[in-house]
Amino acid sequence: MSPGLPVFQPPHAPDRSGRTRDRRFPAPAGLVALLAALAVLPPGAALAGPLGTEAPLGASPGRAPVAKPATPVQCAAPRPGRYVVMGDGVAQNEPVARILQETWHADGSISGIRLERRGQTYREVPYTGRYRSLSLCRAGIERSDDTRTSTSQAVLDAAGRPRYSLGTLPEVVVVSRWFPQRSSACSAALLDGSVLSMQQGRSWKNGQWRPNAVIQNERWRSGSVLGIAISSYGPSIEEATYSGTITVGADCLATVKEQDSLGAVYNYRAVVLADGSGYLYLQTDPDDLTVGYLEHQRARERAAPLP
């Protein structure tokens, strides 16, 4: 036995020799006071205090009270305008990534262009649709192109602009982020300066899609870029510098071509944000599927000015 340690004593077992089903225990003082208070309450009254919410009349004993309906939320109507939508997820067990540039018209109609990857297939197609107001600051959206119809719901900010949306068709798990898009024309000069990004994508290898992730730091000037990418492919980490070019149309649709220091070539379709806050791109190489928002430093400075 170690010096200074107390002698171990087994726990004392309570004496149950005289215990019967009729044995009575004294009620705690708090319970006695509660019962006394309830005895003098008028019918239908609720006891105020830290015991919780009032149980509605007719509630079954032992069940949790039913919450009262919340006060109706005052919401702005869905706001017409031009938007860019970046979506990523799975549809019918295939990875899906897309960028939409669309206009919400005042009559509730939608017109736009869809850049989309579905597995190893890329397509670019115009579409039309409708949007409508839903309760609790939401919008219902339906879009149709030459091959399919999709539906989704978006949550709206205080000004009625969609911020995030979710696909609502069966076997579709796709979430999207929205960006306001000015109606002004775009040019490559909007990207001049520093652009940072982080992305998660997928690579086709050995007959299956495997996850990857990358962070990037780019410097743009007059449509040309120099950058560094740090990538994770699971078993390995890769660092490479790269260079490339972007060709931008007045409609803000763009094409990006890049080559890195390891010899790999990358191809993207993109949408430049007309306010100069960056660009979104979608990879078109069949064995690599990445969609991402590449944020210009000026967007960060607008959100949180440097000291």
List the model feature ranges, each with a label.
Residues 20-28, 67, 302-304:
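General helical structural elements
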Residues 30-42:
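Bacterial N-terminal signal peptides
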Residues 1-26:
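N-terminal secretory signal peptides that target proteins for export/translocation
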Residues 44-47:
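Sec/Tat signal peptide C-region and signal peptidase I cleavage site
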Residues 49-307:
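Mature soluble binding/inhibitory domains
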